[in-house]
Design a protein with these regions (language model features):
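GST-like domain detector, emphasizing the conserved glutathione-binding G-site
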Residues: 1-127
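Generic structural signal for helix capping and beta-alpha/helix-loop junctions
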Residues: 13, 36, 193, 213-214
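Residue-level "edge-of-site" marker
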Residues: 31-32, 189, 209-210
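Phosphate-coordinating loops and pocket residues in cytosolic domains that bind phosphorylated ligands
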Residues: 45, 198, 207
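Short, hydrophobic secondary-structure boundary micro-motifs
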Residues: 81-86, 109-111, 154-159, 203-208
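GST-like fold's C-terminal all-alpha helical module
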Residues: 101-198
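Acidic/histidine-enriched, glycine/proline-rich intrinsically disordered or flexible terminal extensions
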Residues: 208-219
Length: 219
C-alpha cells in the first residue's frame, strides 16, 4: 500500500495518523505542494483535482481519494482499533465533529486557495495569514462549543479512546500552530489535543517530524 502525501498537508496527515493508529504500513510518496508538483500531469492522472492525499492499493485498483473516504475505508478494512463508535448517534456525532474541520474549516486554507488569494486577488501575505487564522479558529471554536457542553466528550472528542474526530481536530490544531493562532479560547480542544499527542501514532505523524519538513516553518 502506498499513499501520496506531503509533510505540510494536513489532509495527508489525517491519513498518516489513521494508518499509524491501525498499525498499517504504507509507503508515503511525497508530492511537494509548495513547488506545485501536484499540478503535474502524472499526479493529475492519479487525482484529477490535484490534491492530497491519494491511496494506492496493492491490488492495483483505482486509487482512493479524499482523506475522509480513505480513513473510513481503512476503518472498514482494518477494524481495530475502531475510529467510529458502534451506535448510530455516536457515529453521527463523531462524523459531525470531523466534518467541521475537514469539510468546513480546512478547505479554506489549503494551498490552492492561498495561491488564488495571492496570485489572482493580489492579497498580501499578512492578510492571507489573517485569512487562515480566521478559518482555522472558526472551526476549532465550533468544535470547542460541542466538546465543552456535550456529555459524550471524554478524554477524547467522543469517549475515552481516539476517533475520527480526534484525527481531524488534532490536524486542525497543527494548522493553527503553523499560523500562530491564539488557541486560548479553545481550552477543551487543546486538552483533547494534548491527550492525543501522548499517543505515538499522533506524535510520530506530526508534520514537522516528516521527511522534508524544515527546521524553521514558513507560511
Amino acid at each position: 500500500m502506498k499513499y501520496y502525501g506531503f509533510w505540510r498537508s494536513l489532509a495527508a496527515c489525517r491519513v498518516r495518523i489513521a494508518l499509524a493508529l491501525k498499525g498499517v504500513k504504507a509507503e508515503e510518496i511525497s508530492v511537494n505542494l509548495m513547488q506545485g508538483e501536484q499540478l503535474k500531469p502524472d499526479y493529475r492522472a492519479v487525482n484529477p483535482l490535484a490534491v492530497l492525499p491519494s491511496l494506492i492499493l496493492d491490488d492495483g485498483s483505482t486509487p482512493l481519494f479524499e482523506s475522509m473516504a480513505i480513513i473510513e475505508y481503512l476503518d472498514e478494512t482494518h477494524p481495530q482499533p475502531p475510529l467510529l463508535p458502534k451506535d448510530p448517534k455516536g457515529r453521527a456525532r463523531v462524523r459531525g465533529l470531523a466534518q467541521i474541520v475537514a469539510c468546513d474549516g480546512h478547505p479554506l486554507i489549503v494551498p490552492r486557495v492561498r495561491n488564488y488569494l495571492e496570485k489572482e486577488l493580489k492579497i498580501d501575505e499578512p492578510s492571507r495569514t489573517k485569512w487562515c487564522q480566521h478559518w482555522l479558529m472558526e472551526a476549532l471554536t465550533a468544535v470547542e462549543s460541542h466538546l465543552a457542553k456535550e456529555k459524550e466528550t471524554g478524554k477524547f472528542c467522543h469517549g475515552d479512546s481516539p476517533t475520527l474526530a480526534d484525527v481531524c481536530v488534532a490536524t486542525q490544531v497543527f494548522g493553527a500552530k503553523f499560523f500562530n493562532c491564539d488557541t486560548a479560547p479553545v481550552p477543551t480542544v487543546m486538552r483533547v489535543f494534548e491527550q492525543c499527542m501522548k499517543i505515538e501514532a499522533f506524535d510520530k505523524s506530526h508534520p514537522l517530524k516528516q521527511p522534508g519538513a524544515p527546521k524553521e516553518l514558513k507560511h
